[in-house]
């Protein structure tokens, strides 16, 4: 799909146009002009009750009197001044469904007339593009017979003026690219997407951007570094663990401290010796959702060429049962030197992450954000709507909350205090790898915090938001929009 910004006179439109109508029958500015051109044609339709302006209602008009456009899509915009982001995205979804049902190849959208509550033109256009891209995404690489998509639409033009509108399109396209990249990797089956495959994707990204350099550490490299907790998780798998470092450097000051994003990359997690239930185990291919999202973010910022230094780290690994697998009761010495008693081999993500969080100290980062499908407890607490946010730095937490609100990629901050460290005490080691039944998402974050004292740190638990279940089963690409928005804000000083 191609997206463009162009100030277009209504009278000059020959193809297809999208305009808005409010629930009380009030016409948007563009609809009002067409009503005047057509000598009250739209007003007559409103009076007859053929269109009511109900949110998401779409009426397709052809042969509008005195008007040369092939089709006019009249879209119900609900109550004027009350439409929120979620409603606007649904409006766009309903509109694109109506357009796709026709043979329209090009549409010119005047929905920039529609005011989203507490938002401006930038967000109107950006949400439009992001929603359109979500609606057309399909993952069919492994189907012998592809879906028949008889969709003619190839061009969407936003009738607007100024740099803000073009910036919205540019940002949205880059974010959509990142989301798509994250989805493609996460949806890939685990017999294909193993740690080596993840590393190959990282290397391929470096070939597509001159701003990126990739380094991959294998198990021998990690053993030499003392990353024993990470390696213990991998012991049960024949597929070697891979730690992929994607270095993006484009800051005006080449020595500027980097922002580091760490993604948990368990390409399959059977739970190890503490085996998971069979039902739903196929979804554990999504346990690399953190690494997938970091990979997606790196794609997006390379497209945007943000003036930042950012390092994306994909901590690839598998957790499988085997005669060589690590066991409950094992005590592991981490790269940091702290010892950890393994009480549950299915609490493996924190073991992979703790060594990775220690490893990234060498970059002297400005800040570190780890992203992980870490705990079922986070899903119980927040459901599938909000990612869990934990941080030892209030400023960083607030910046992430702002980016979450701006992008509508929601996150909710969870508490973190010394009392949660009490739950991680072990009689035999410095730490236990689980903290008991209560507050599991928080104790997981508390565990990780023991390895982050050298920098500002935040943790995003995306166990509930990384993929969907049911009829729409598949990766969501979250929290790519949140993280890219955070980086845009960092680049612009907001």
Curated annotation (Swiss-Prot):
Encoding gene, per UniProt annotation:
pepA
Q: Where in the cell is it found?
A: Cytoplasm
What InterPro entries is this protein classified in? Leucine_aapep/pepB, Macro_dom-like, Peptidase_M17_C, Peptidase_M17_leu_NH2_pept, Peptidase_M17_N
**E.C. designation(s):** 3.4.11.1, 3.4.11.10
What is this enzyme's catalytic activity, as reactions? Release of an N-terminal amino acid, Xaa-|-Yaa-, in which Xaa is preferably Leu, but may be other amino acids including Pro although not Arg or Lys, and Yaa may be Pro. Amino acid amides and methyl esters are also readily hydrolyzed, but rates on arylamides are exceedingly low; Release of an N-terminal amino acid, preferentially leucine, but not glutamic or aspartic acids
Class of this enzyme: hydrolase
Q: Which Pfam families match?
A: Peptidase_M17, Peptidase_M17_N
Q: Give the CDD domains listed for this entry.
A: Peptidase_M17
The family database entries (PANTHER family) matched by this protein are listed as:
CYTOSOL AMINOPEPTIDASE, LEUCINE AMINOPEPTIDASE-RELATED
Which residues does the entry assign to the active site, renumbered to this chain?
Answer: 276, 350
Q: What is this protein called?
A: Probable cytosol aminopeptidase
Q: State the family named in the UniProt similarity comment for this chain.
A: Belongs to the peptidase M17 family.
Q: Which residues bind Mn(2+) 1?
A: 269, 346, 348
State how the cofactor is bound: Binds 2 manganese ions per subunit.
Upper classification of the organism:
Bacteria, Pseudomonadati, Pseudomonadota, Gammaproteobacteria, Pasteurellales
Q: Which cofactor does it need?
A: Mn(2+)
Entry binding sites for Mn(2+) 2: 264, 269, 287, 348
Q: What GO annotations for molecular function exist for this entry?
A: manganese ion binding; metalloaminopeptidase activity
């Amino acid at each position: 799909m191609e997206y463009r910004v162009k100030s277009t006179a209504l009278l000059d439109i020959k193809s297809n146009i999208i305009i808005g109508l409010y629930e009380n029958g009030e016409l948007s500015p563009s609809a009002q002009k067409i009503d005047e051109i057509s000598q009250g044609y739209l007003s007559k339709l409103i009076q007859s009750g053929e269109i009511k302006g109900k949110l998401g209602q779409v009426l397709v008009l052809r042969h509008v009197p005195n008007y040369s456009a092939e089709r006019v899509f009249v879209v119900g915009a609900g109550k004027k001044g009350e439409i929120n982001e979620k409603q606007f995205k649904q409006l766009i979804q309903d509109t694109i469904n109506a357009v796709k049902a026709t043979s329209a190849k090009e549409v010119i959208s005047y929905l920039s007339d529609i005011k989203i509550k507490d938002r401006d033109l930038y967000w109107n256009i950006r949400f439009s593009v992001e929603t359109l891209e979500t609606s057309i995404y399909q993952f069919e690489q492994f189907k012998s017979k592809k879906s028949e998509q008889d969709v003619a639409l190839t061009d969407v033009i936003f009738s607007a003026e100024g740099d803000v509108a073009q910036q919205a399109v540019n940002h949205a396209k880059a974010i959509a690219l990142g989301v798509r990249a994250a989805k493609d990797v996460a949806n890939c089956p685990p017999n294909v997407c193993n740690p080596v495959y993840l590393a190959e994707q990282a290397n391929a990204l470096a070939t597509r951007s001159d701003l990126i350099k990739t380094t991959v550490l294998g198990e021998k490299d990690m053993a030499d570094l003392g990353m024993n907790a990470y390696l213990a998780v991998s012991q049960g798998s024949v597929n070697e663990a891979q730690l992929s470092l994607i270095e993006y450097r484009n800051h005006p000051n080449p020595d500027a401290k980097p922002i580091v994003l760490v993604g948990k990359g368990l390409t399959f997690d059977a739970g190890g010796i503490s085996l998971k239930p069979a039902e739903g185990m196929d979804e554990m291919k999504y346990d690399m959702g953190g690494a997938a999202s970091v990979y997606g973010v790196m794609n997006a910022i390379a497209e945007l060429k943000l003036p930042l230094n950012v390092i994306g780290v994909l901590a690839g690994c598998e957790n499988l049962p085997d005669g060589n697998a690590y066991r409950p009761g094992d005590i592991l010495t981490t790269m940091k030197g702290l010892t950890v008693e393994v009480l549950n081999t299915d609490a493996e993500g924190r073991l992979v992450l703790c060594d990775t969080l220690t490893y990234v100290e060498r970059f002297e980062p400005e800040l570190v954000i780890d992203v992980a499908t870490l705990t079922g407890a986070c899903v119980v607490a927040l459901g599938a709507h909000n990612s869990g946010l934990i941080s030892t730095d209030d400023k960083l937490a607030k910046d992430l909350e702002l980016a979450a609100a701006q992008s509508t990629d929601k996150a909710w901050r969870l508490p973190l205090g010394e009392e949660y460290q009490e739950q991680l005490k072990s009689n035999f080691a410095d730490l236990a790898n689980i903290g008991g039944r209560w507050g599991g998402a928080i104790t997981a974050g508390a565990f990780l915090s023991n390895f982050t004292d050298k920098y500002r740190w935040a943790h995003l638990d995306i166990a509930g938001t990384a993929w969907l279940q049911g009829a729409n089963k598949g990766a969501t690409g979250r929290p790519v929009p949140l993280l890219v928005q955070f980086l845009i804000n960092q680049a612009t000083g907001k």
